[in-house]
Structures are given as structure tokens and as C-alpha cells.
Amino acid sequence: DSAPVLEPTVFLVTLHSMSSPDEIFHIADDAAFTRTALEVFHRQAAACVPYREYLTRIGVEPEQVRSPEEIPFLPIELFKTHDIYCGETPPEAVFTSSATTGMTPSRHPMQSLALYEQAFRAAFRTFYGAPEHWSLYALLPNYLRRKGSSLVYMADRLIADCGSGGFYLDDYEALLEAMARDGKPKILLGVSYALWDLAERYAPKLRGTVVMETGGMKGYREEIPKEEFHKI
């Protein structure tokens, strides 16, 4: 099976903008989502200077935005050149993207790591249930070789919650041996090019395993359409 990876850092930009961040974990219907999305938008438009300037440049008046569909997205390039942050206290951590060689990484200040953990743990339980019922194996070589990865931070905490699994840098054989011995349902979280290498070199039969793909090819292999990649 395959599943999309959780991407909580973008979600946290929203959480940090709420007057009561815990509210977002209790959205139960479309009306509540719309109300919360507009609250977040108006607070960011007022408190986040780069976003406010962007809205001015594209001619958007915040008071005229009346639905989530009308909320402008901030171009990802600005996360490389500006501090996109509207917390009232300094961030506890600053996560960085895994930029391709020679490119500038984007930066994601996190006001609260506890809130970040609450977000990805809630997302995990929503899609997969109790973590202790799973083993989480992480094949994230390029992420482990650098500092500041929100994905590694998330995987490390979820592996601890699961109580089994672990990180594997480039040791595919050790990974497959550990998974073969593991009787629990498994999640294999891997960057795209490493999963491709694993499939090409070993053609493993991953029974009882959900494959969670993330990250793209990172310059290690050619980029191909997702539909074609998932057939590999």
C-alpha cells in the first residue's frame, strides 16, 4: 500500500496564527473550517509583515476576502528570503527545507515544538490509529545528513511513540532484515529516490507494510510523474 506523507510544518504556520491554537484540532464541519480559516487569514494579514506586503502588492484587501477559496497563498520563494513568522515570542526552533545543491533553503520558524508534536501526532492517529500498533521505519538519507529537518524531528518522535522501527541511512539490507523479523504492521517512510533504489536493487516483498513517500528525487534521479513512480 502507499500513503501520502504527513506535512505538519505548513499546518503549523496556521496553528501559530490562531488566538487559541487548540481550536483547530476540534473542527467538526465545513462552517467551523471556514470560520477558522478566515480567522487565521485575517490575523496573518495583520501580524505577518511579509504576508501583508505581499497582499498589498497583488492588490488584495483582507476585508474583501470572505471564503477560504479567496485566500491568497504566499509563494514558497518568500520562505527563502523572509522570516514568515507572527509569533509574539521568539521561535523555539527554525526548521529548514532540504534544498537541492546550490539552492537557498526555505526557513520555517516554529513558535512551539509542543504544538508541532501535537499536530503530527493528531494527524497520525487520524490516518493510522494508535502508534503503538505500528512499527515505523525511516529511510531518509539526505535528511539525516543535514540539520534542521522537520521530517526527521517528526519521524524520531513517532518512532518513539511506536516503540519499534528506526532510522536507516543507506543500509538497505539491515532495513529489510529488521522489517522481515518484525511481526507488527509496518510503515516505511522514505524519500522517493531511496525507495526507488530499494525497489530496483532488492525488489522487496513488503507484506503488511504501508509505504509513505516523501521528498522527491533531490537531484539524485530524474523526476518522473507520480503515477509512473508508484508503479515501480
Question: Which functions belong to the PLM regions below?
Answer:
Residues 1-17:
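N-terminal amphipathic/basic-hydrophobic helices that include classical n-h-c signal peptides
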